């Protein structure tokens, strides 16, 4: 009997501490700074007012919104040359000005991995 009283008391306290919709902070949409899919930092989301007589301000705001949407959809660009380099080519400084010509004294990858 004493165990059930403690259980009821414990559940009452838990329910009183539970977050209710009134005590939860209201979600106000996507505000503030955010990252797009490529990792670029974007400014706050543009909210257009409902006034129809703003003229050029509405047009420029729509242009900015279109630019943000276009930038968000761009793929992340990577240099194809950077992905094709080997470990040796990445960390070895060439003696000539041409990055494609590597010094002959540099060991190949298999020799360095087997050390």
UniProtKB/Swiss-Prot annotation:
UniProt entry keywords in alphabetical sequence: Cleavage on pair of basic residues, Hormone, Neuropeptide, Secreted, Signal
Subcellular localization: Secreted
Cited Pfam families: Galanin
InterPro entries documented for this protein: Galanin, GALP
Keyword Signal listed: yes
An example Gene Ontology biological process: regulation of appetite
Domain of life, per lineage: Eukaryota
GO cellular component terms listed in the entry, alphabetical order: extracellular region
Propeptide: 86-115
Signal sequence extent: 1-23
Coiled-coil ranges (or none): none
Gene Ontology molecular function, alphabetical: hormone activity
Family: Belongs to the galanin family.
Function according to Swiss-Prot or TrEMBL: Hypothalamic neuropeptide which binds to the G-protein-coupled galanin receptors (GALR1, GALR2 and GALR3). Involved in a large number of putative physiological functions in CNS homeostatic processes, including the regulation of gonadotropin-releasing hormone secretion.
The protein, known as: Galanin-like peptide
Origin species: Rattus norvegicus
Organism lineage: Eukaryota, Metazoa, Chordata, Craniata, Vertebrata
